[in-house]
Amino acid sequence: MAEAFEGHYDREIATPNLSPATRSASDATRERTMRIGGAMFFTDYSMSPTELARALEDRGFDSLWVPEHSHIPLTRKSPFPSGGDLPKKYYDVMDPFVVLGAAAAVTKTLLLGTGICLIAQRDPIQTAKQVASIDQVSGGRFLFGVGNGWNEDEMANHGTAFANRHKLARERVEAMKAIWTESKAEYHGEFVNFEPMMAWPKPVQKPHPPIIVGGAFPYGARRALRYGNGWMPHRSRTQYADVQALLPKFREMAAEAGRDPALVPITIWGARENLDLLKRDRDDGVSRLVISLDSGKADTILPELDRWATLIRQLGS
């Protein structure tokens, strides 16, 4: 019986015909039109995930992004990257995969992204299954935004040494790629190690959902080129114009790394309600902008989305 069961999985990984929504996720690098996504820290006092997801899709946004913090320790060895006190929503944010599963159930074309998933403090085998499951449930609409994190105390509670987080994250991404793409996967690294095993389902998108690596220039950009399918810098943590200056540097770095710059899309986190600035981003080759929404209710969020919907139409996104 065990041999028969094992033989059931001893097969090629199927490559299905992808839906238009899936193609837009997998082939984002080929899109010339800049997309606009929305992000929120979902809490028990914000709009619900289903409510916001429907509102975004109805208004022409291409994607919903959700962040991750498993908890916030009361000690603080590392400062908040954006400066000042840590906002309350960081303590209260919901689980990203639960949120995206709910959003997937009420939408048809909206892409669904983690922004970002803290892979340095996550088990790669369990996370690989969550990624594959949400990609299946959504019909291939998942975007895997990943990052290594900044909160040293939060990582420590997960058993992650802050000094090792970058190499650990890389190994975990490599291990997850093996799980997604191999019928019988194994991985042997310094921090991640497992013998041949089977893990299903596999993602709808082949070889796997796009891995969009968050992080500043130059180190985050290098990680994106090393194991990612796109780069996602955070505009609020640098001067607005500085991101523009970094785009040609990133493309030069991509070419030096043997990557076609045109096939490594750039998603910028942070945008202003200004058509001229949006056009500048579009003309500079930015693939997507993600706007950060407060953890508010519909009466405050929907008017903001309506203003953005007008800009999206004017932009032609």
Predicted feature descriptions by range:
Residues 1-11:
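Extreme N-terminal basic, low-complexity initiation segments
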Residues 6, 14-17, 23-317:
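Active-site-adjacent structural elements that line small-molecule/cofactor binding pockets in enzymes
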